Every structure is written in C-alpha cells, then in structure tokens.
Amino acid sequence: MSVDAATVRRIAHLARIAVDDAEVPHLQDELNAILAFVEQLQEVNVDGVEPMTSVTPMAMKMRTDVVNDGEIADRIVANAPVTHDHFFLVPKVVE
C-alpha cells in the first residue's frame, strides 16, 4: 500500500493539521515508511502465541473499594475565593 500526496493532504485535513505543499513529500515518505513497517509486522507468524497486555509478567493486586473524599477537601476549597459547605461558589453566567 502506498500513500499519495492527495491522501497526505486528506489525512492532514481530517487531523486539522496545516500542511504546506513543501511538507507533503516528506510526510508522504514518512507515512509510506510507517505502512511498510506495519506490512512487515503482518508477516510475523503468531500462531500459538498467547495475547499479552504487558511484556513483563505481573498481577494486579486487588484491594477493597472504599469510598473516601481523598482527605484533602479542605485544602482544595481553600484555594477558592468563595465557598459554601465545601462547594465552590461561582458567578451565574447563564440567565
């Protein structure tokens, strides 16, 4: 698969990236190199290989799910200019 200049411009448009005409050939080469690498990965035989979520074996430690307020609510609201019952008070912006 090969990326042409029109595809580079379309990808840039979809990503909302401004691309000058002078940059298109360089980006085209970059995208073609990425696609060539992905095509190379497609050729790897993975039959019998278990799916992995990490390259290092590890088990997540389970803990009880306890709801708390983080014990810093007072410090957080201390930064606000106006508060009431641990809530930030802000001016009304919509009528």
UniProtKB/Swiss-Prot annotation:
Enzyme class at the top of the EC tree: ligase
EC code(s) of this entry: 6.3.5.-
Coiled coil: none
Keywords assigned: ATP-binding, Ligase, Nucleotide-binding, Protein biosynthesis
InterPro entries attached to this UniProt entry: Asp/Glu-ADT_sf_sub_c (IPR036113), GatC (IPR003837)
Stored Gene3D superfamilies: Glu-tRNAGln amidotransferase C subunit, N-terminal domain (1.10.20.60)
Molecular function GO labels: asparaginyl-tRNA synthase (glutamine-hydrolyzing) activity; ATP binding; glutaminyl-tRNA synthase (glutamine-hydrolyzing) activity
GO biological process: glutaminyl-tRNAGln biosynthesis via transamidation; regulation of translational fidelity; translation
Statement: the UniProt record of this protein carries the keyword Hydrolase: no
Catalysed reactions listed for this entry: L-glutamyl-tRNA(Gln) + L-glutamine + ATP + H2O = L-glutaminyl-tRNA(Gln) + L-glutamate + ADP + phosphate + H(+); L-aspartyl-tRNA(Asn) + L-glutamine + ATP + H2O = L-asparaginyl-tRNA(Asn) + L-glutamate + ADP + phosphate + 2 H(+)
Keyword Lipid biosynthesis (UniProt): no
Similarity comment: family membership: Belongs to the GatC family.
Known role: Allows the formation of correctly charged Asn-tRNA(Asn) or Gln-tRNA(Gln) through the transamidation of misacylated Asp-tRNA(Asn) or Glu-tRNA(Gln) in organisms which lack either or both of asparaginyl-tRNA or glutaminyl-tRNA synthetases. The reaction takes place in the presence of glutamine and ATP through an activated phospho-Asp-tRNA(Asn) or phospho-Glu-tRNA(Gln).
UniProt xrefs under NCBIfam families: gatC
Stated name of the protein: Aspartyl/glutamyl-tRNA(Asn/Gln) amidotransferase subunit C
Organism (species): Nitrobacter winogradskyi (strain ATCC 25391 / DSM 10237 / CIP 104748 / NCIMB 11846 / Nb-255)
